[in-house]
């Protein structure tokens, strides 16, 4: 299923504008970006207040995720579905302590629903329970969580790690040297992905892991990390990452080496680089969906409306294969990550599929620009 490219351009443009707003809160001002401008409280009546707590803002995926939420929340506010909204980004490097303090501050503002992209699968349990005890609907996304009172929306990180590794390993003929670039170490998704990657590598005895670095699922970070080990690894056939391939490619180029098979990020810059360089060596682009924040908002609104929502939902990852690469590349800004365009109707289709034991509904891929 496809939708017109003009819709994707509007999504990308709105997200780019929102980035300017929420990066201020990421610096630790504590104010966040919000929809409660002067006078809106008087107009909101009993419409719900939706708050988002984000535990880490240090990569483009997280920035796209917050921007997607803000764009959708702004439209929901204009449509009279919510009274106000707020997105707050915890400062620091994925610190559970800082996010807990952030959430406690949000609870004092009495939101009706709290969306959380957590920094830890366990440390936030007490503060989440505190929110539930206060009657707040809690939807955690982008990670599993040890908090029975919360609803959870996430992608399959096993699928992500599998699609990031297997095509690449097959592309290099199942043998050679690889570098593994890990993501946000300490988070539940990264732990699950690394475990999957190691399991897959064990099925390829002729592949040697020459080095392991921490790229944080961020191109710039991965570029520095990979460049730091290239001098000690004479030959590299592939780099298994979590959406940091553009930076990895730059590391090889700056070192005067051929670009091996990599796991590209799903943003416009990486996809156009992949396209323009005519790379066909097992590379793939795959990441979790930053649009999960929007799906979480629809889940929260359904819960507030008394509708049934599964306690745990697994939504499709964003896999960009070569056949869809050009369509995505044509509608994304350089720093904009591919995100599924969740509408309330599409979310309800996912709920129905989950309740009936069916496969997740595949969201639409954009049509290529004219």
What are these regions (language model features)?
Residues 22-26:
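C-terminal motif of bacterial Sec signal peptides marking the signal peptidase cleavage site
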Residues 2-10, 27-370:
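A residue-level marker of the well-folded mature domains of exported/periplasmic proteins
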Residues 8-19:
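Sec-dependent N-terminal signal peptides
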């Amino acid at each position: 299923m496809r939708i017109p490219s003009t819709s994707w351009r509007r999504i990308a443009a709105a997200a780019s504008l929102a980035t300017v707003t929420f990066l201020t809160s990421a610096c630790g001002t504590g104010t966040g970006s919000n929809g409660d401008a002067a006078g809106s409280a008087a107009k909101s009546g009993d419409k719900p207040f939706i708050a988002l707590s984000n535990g880490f803002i240090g990569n483009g995926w997280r920035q796209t995720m917050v921007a997607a939420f803000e764009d959708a929340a702004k439209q929901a506010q204009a449509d009279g579905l919510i009274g106000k909204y707020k997105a707050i980004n915890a400062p620091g490097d994925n610190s559970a302590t800082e996010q807990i303090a952030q959430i406690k501050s949000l609870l004092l503002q009495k939101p009706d629903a709290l969306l959380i992209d957590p920094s830890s699968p366990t440390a936030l349990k007490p503060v989440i329970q505190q929110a539930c005890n206060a009657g707040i609907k809690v939807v955690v996304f982008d990670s599993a969580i040890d908090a029975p009172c919360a609803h959870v929306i996430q992608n399959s990180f096993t699928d992500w790690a599998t699609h990031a590794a297997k095509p690449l390993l097959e592309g290099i003929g199942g043998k050679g040297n690889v570098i593994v670039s890990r993501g946000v170490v300490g988070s539940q998704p990264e732990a699950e992905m690394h475990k999957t990657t190691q399991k897959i590598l064990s099925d390829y005895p002729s592949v040697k892991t020459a080095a392991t670095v921490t790229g944080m699922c961020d191109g710039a970070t991965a570029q520095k990390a990979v460049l730091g080990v290239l001098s000690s690894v004479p030959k590299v056939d592939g780099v298994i990452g979590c959406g940091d391939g553009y930076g990895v490619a730059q590391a090889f180029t700056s070192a005067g080496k051929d670009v091996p098979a990599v796991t590209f990020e799903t943003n416009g810059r990486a996809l156009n680089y992949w396209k323009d360089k005519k790379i066909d060596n097992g590379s793939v682009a795959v990441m979790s969906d930053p649009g999960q924040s929007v799906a979480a908002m629809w889940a929260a609104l359904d819960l507030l409306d008394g509708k049934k929502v599964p306690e745990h939902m697994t939504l499709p990852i964003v896999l960009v294969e070569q056949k869809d690469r050009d369509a995505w590349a044509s509608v994304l800004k350089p720093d904009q990550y591919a995100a599924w365009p969740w509408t309330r109707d599409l979310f309800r289709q996912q709920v129905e599929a989950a309740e009936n034991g069916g496969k997740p509904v595949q969201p639409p891929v954009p049509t290529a620009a004219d």
